[in-house]
């Protein structure tokens, strides 16, 4: 059996410059906020995701797609550049309490063999981390996910995202990110996708210290995501995180959020977003070169 490794989703430099287009109801809300006619149709999301894959995958080492809105269409339309690997989201988002993702389970409809036949090289699992929920349940889900990936020769990517506890109102996001890393940073996955400390804000030295604390607890290669980070601050965030030990990024919003809801999205993705992604890829290569 052909077994993929993280080297199959990196750039030649060994760094990760990966694009996420697997946002689901959150993306629908972004379109609604941008003034798209309500209710925002599934086809609006699918078209945007497929167009993003076509316009941006030449500049990404991998692209993360979701089953619900775009996996089949992306495969059928050959939307992903040959130089770019496909990652498929293996998480099912369960809405509740007024938010689009209140809990997450492994998507039982996932077919790893089919994904591999379609050119997929990795699966991704979102893990919501709350201090007052059962750690063992999270660890068990990650273990099952890792086995699902590795038994089919696919790369396992976990994405712990911290949330306020179910009960009580005390929430220290920064400490929660560290606590999640302590719990899941040595869980047997191949790659750890993490929220940027401090939302990428503040003095560089503070950001670096926070990122180094994170690095101390993650015993696998790790990359940052861009949700919650101002897109103008994201290139610096990539530099700082990589100085601390990260190996790149897997990000969506910092690349394409500014064109959601604009006309001519194919053109916008090509003219506005592609240069951003190219610049981020250059930063990854530059930071990897410093390690040699």
From Swiss-Prot:
Enzyme class: lyase
UniProt entry tagged with the keyword Lyase: yes
Entries under InterPro entries matching the protein: Aldolase_TIM, DeoC/FbaB/LacD_aldolase, LacD_aldolase, SFP_aldolase_YihT
Phenotype on disruption: Mutant fails to grow on sulfoquinovose as a sole carbon source.
GO terms of molecular function: 6-deoxy-6-sulfofructose-1-phosphate aldolase activity
Active site positions: 193
Induction: Induced during growth with sulfoquinovose.
Reaction(s) this enzyme catalyzes, per UniProt: 6-deoxy-6-sulfo-D-fructose 1-phosphate = (2S)-3-sulfolactaldehyde + dihydroxyacetone phosphate
Its EC number(s): 4.1.2.57
One example of a Gene Ontology biological process annotation: 6-sulfoquinovose(1-) catabolic process to glycerone phosphate and 3-sulfolactaldehyde
Keywords on record: Carbohydrate metabolism, Lyase, Schiff base
Function: Cleaves 6-deoxy-6-sulfo-D-fructose 1-phosphate (SFP) to form dihydroxyacetone phosphate (DHAP) and 3-sulfolactaldehyde (SLA).
Family: Belongs to the aldolase LacD family.
Family matches, as HAMAP family: SFP_aldolase
Assembly description: Homotetramer.
Protein name (record): Sulfofructosephosphate aldolase
The organism of origin for this protein: Escherichia coli (strain K12)
């Amino acid at each position: 059996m052909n077994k993929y490794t993280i080297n199959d989703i990196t750039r030649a430099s060994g760094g990760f410059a990966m694009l996420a287009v697997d946002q689901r109801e959150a993306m629908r809300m972004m379109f609604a906020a941008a003034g798209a006619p309500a209710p925002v149709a599934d086809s609006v999301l699918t078209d945007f995701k497929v167009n993003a894959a076509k316009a941006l995958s030449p500049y990404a080492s991998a692209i993360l797609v979701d089953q619900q809105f775009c996996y089949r269409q992306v495969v059928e339309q050959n939307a992903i550049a040959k130089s770019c690997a496909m990652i498929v989201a293996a998480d099912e988002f369960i809405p509740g309490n007024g938010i689009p993702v209140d809990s997450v389970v492994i998507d039982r409809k996932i077919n790893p063999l089919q994904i591999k036949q379609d050119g997929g090289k990795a699966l991704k699992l979102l893990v919501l981390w709350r201090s007052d929920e059962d750690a063992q349940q999270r660890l068990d889900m990650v273990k099952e996910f890792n086995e699902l990936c590795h038994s089919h020769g696919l790369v396992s990517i976990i994405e712990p995202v911290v949330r306020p506890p179910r009960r009580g109102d005390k929430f220290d996001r920064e400490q929660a990110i560290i606590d999640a890393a302590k719990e899941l940073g040595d869980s047997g996955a191949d790659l750890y996708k993490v929220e940027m400390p401090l939302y990428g804000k503040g003095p560089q030295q503070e950001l670096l210290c926070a990122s180094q604390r994170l690095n101390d607890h993650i015993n696998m290669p790790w990359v940052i995501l861009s949700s919650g980070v101002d897109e103008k601050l994201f290139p610096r965030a990539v530099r700082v995180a990589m100085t601390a030990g990260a190996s790149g990024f897997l990000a969506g919003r910092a690349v394409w959020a500014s064109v959601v809801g604009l006309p001519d999205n194919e053109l916008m993705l090509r003219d506005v977003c592609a240069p951003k992604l190219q610049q981020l890829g250059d930063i990854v290569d530059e930071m990897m070169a410093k390690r040699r």
